[in-house]
Amino acid sequence: MTVSGSHVVAKGPKGELIKDLPAGLTITIVDGVAKVVPTEGAGTESVNWGLGRSLLSNMITGVSEGFKTVMEFSGVGYKAQAKGPDLEMNLGFTNPVMIKALPGVTFQIEKSVVTVMGMDKESVGHVAAQMRAARPPEPYKGSGVKYQDEIIRKKAGKKAAGATGAA
């Protein structure tokens, strides 16, 4: 890892990430441990201290292990297939929905489960959010695109609510 001012370059087995951390932070590397502290006399710039630490931590984790988000498709005919580096999803619309893969993001497709993988946590999360936004889970049956660990609160519906007929 190299640091020059607020510009950080992290290299690892998965690749290289370059990021500019918020101003007003000083990054030091001592004995292989990176520390982020607010610059002396920075005033209100110390509000970005936690953000800078998290960004640096995510860069290190990304270049060493990577990030992944698992998405599940539930619904009749809902599926996904790869079209080059991009993802084509059939979600019950007239035309398929295309999701562009950001640089460094890859897809692994198994039946109704798509795993979004990459070095940059922000890019992986952005692509996963785009997938979910294309057809969010609906509250009655739960069909749609959801995160694997997401719990969908289902509504009762007319029959379960005890609707009485007009008599």
Predicted region positions:
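Ribosome-associated RNA-binding proteins
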Residues: M1-A167
